[in-house]
A protein has these predicted regions:
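Ser/Thr-rich, Pro/Gly/Ala-heavy low-complexity intrinsically disordered linkers and tails
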Residues: 1-41
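Interdomain/boundary linker segments immediately adjacent to catalytic/signaling cores
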Residues: 36-117
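Structural alpha-beta junctions
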Residues: 114-123, 219-240
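A short acidic/basic microdomain associated with nuclease active sites
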Residues: 114-143
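Active-site beta-strand-loop-beta-strand hairpin of nuclease catalytic cores
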Residues: 141-153
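Loop/turn elements at helix/coil->beta-strand transitions in domains of secreted/extracellular proteins
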Residues: 146-149, 196-200, 226-229
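Catalytic cores of nucleic-acid endonucleases
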Residues: 154-221
C-alpha cells in the first residue's frame, strides 16, 4: 500500500453533466484496505482506501475498485479557497474544461488522487491531444508511479441534487456509457504524446445508498465493457452540495 502523500503539482472522458445515473464498480476490496489512515490535509478530509493503488495495478489487465470518503466541513468557495488546493487542483480551477458542467467535481476527483495516491498533474481535458480530434475525450491525464494514466470523472446521483436516491436503471445506463467512453478515448488518444497505460473512472456520489447502487449496476456489466479500468468510487459527506450543483 502506497504511503499517503501531499502533492504540490496540478489537473479531467467527455465532460457532460451526469445527473440521472451513477458510474460503476465491480467488487468491493478487502476490509483491511478500507482502514487506511486519512490522507494528508487539504480542503476536505479524506479517509478510506487512501494509498490503495500499487504500481502493479496501473499495468494489470484486470480492473480494480477503490472506495474513499471525502468529508467537507463547509462548502468550497472559488476563487477564495483555491490556495487550499494542490497545485494541480489550482491549475484545473483556472483552466476551462471542454464545455462540461462539472468543473468542481473534476477538481476534487483530482484532489483525491493527488492526496491519496501521490498523483501528479500532466494535462487537463483541453490539453490532451487526440487523433482524430473528434475522439471521445477523457477529463485529465496524471502521472502515477511513473505511469501516464487517463482519468474520466462523473457524478452518480439523481438530479436535481436532493431529489431522491439513484435508481438502478439510470445507474446501469451511466455505467455502460462511462466505461464505453473510456474505451473510445483510449483508442483516440495520440500515441506518441499522451498515450496512457490505462484509465481511472473517478465517480463521486453523495451517500452510501447511491454508492451501493452504482456498484450493483457495475456488477451487471459484461467484463469486456469494464476492461482494465480502475474504479475510484468516492462518497462525499458534510457540506458537499457544491460538487453536485456546480453547473
Amino acid at each position: 500500500m502506497r504511503p499517503v502523500l501531499v502533492l504540490c503539482l496540478a489537473a479531467a472522458c467527455g465532460s457532460s453533466p451526469d445527473h440521472a445515473s451513477p458510474d460503476a464498480a465491480w467488487a468491493p476490496q478487502d476490509a483491511k484496505d478500507i482502514d487506511a489512515p486519512p490522507a494528508a490535509t487539504g480542503f476536505g478530509d479524506l479517509s478510506g482506501m487512501c494509498g490503495a493503488l500499487a504500481e502493479a495495478d496501473l499495468t494489470s489487465p484486470s480492473p480494480k475498485t477503490v472506495q474513499v470518503n471525502f468529508n467537507f466541513a463547509r462548502a468550497y468557495m472559488d476563487p477564495a479557497d483555491r490556495p487550499l488546493l494542490t497545485a494541480g487542483g489550482q491549475h484545473m480551477a483556472a483552466t476551462p474544461n471542454a464545455g462540461g458542467s462539472s468543473g468542481l467535481s473534476e477538481i476534487f476527483a483530482y484532489e483525491e488522487l493527488a492526496r491519496c495516491e501521490g498523483a501528479m498533474f500532466l494535462k487537463s481535458e483541453t490539453e490532451i491531444i487526440y487523433d482524430p480530434v473528434t475522439s471521445k475525450k477523457t477529463d485529465l491525464e496524471i502521472m502515477l508511479d511513473g505511469h501516464k494514466i487517463g482519468v474520466s470523472v462523473t457524478r452518480a446521483f439523481k438530479g436535481p441534487f436532493g431529489s431522491g436516491p439513484l435508481d438502478m436503471a439510470s445507474a446501469v445506463t451511466l455505467t455502460t456509457k462511462k466505461f464505453s467512453d473510456i474505451h473510445d478515448s483510449t483508442a483516440g488518444v495520440q500515441t506518441t504524446v499522451d498515450k496512457w497505460d490505462k484509465q481511472i473512472l473517478a465517480v463521486e456520489t453523495d451517500d452510501a445508498e447511491d454508492a451501493a447502487t452504482f456498484l450493483a449496476a457495475t456488477a451487471t456489466l459484461d467484463p469486456s465493457v469494464i476492461g482494465d479500468t480502475i474504479l475510484v468510487l468516492t462518497t462525499t459527506d458534510g457540506d458537499d452540495g457544491f460538487i453536485y450543483t456546480n453547473m
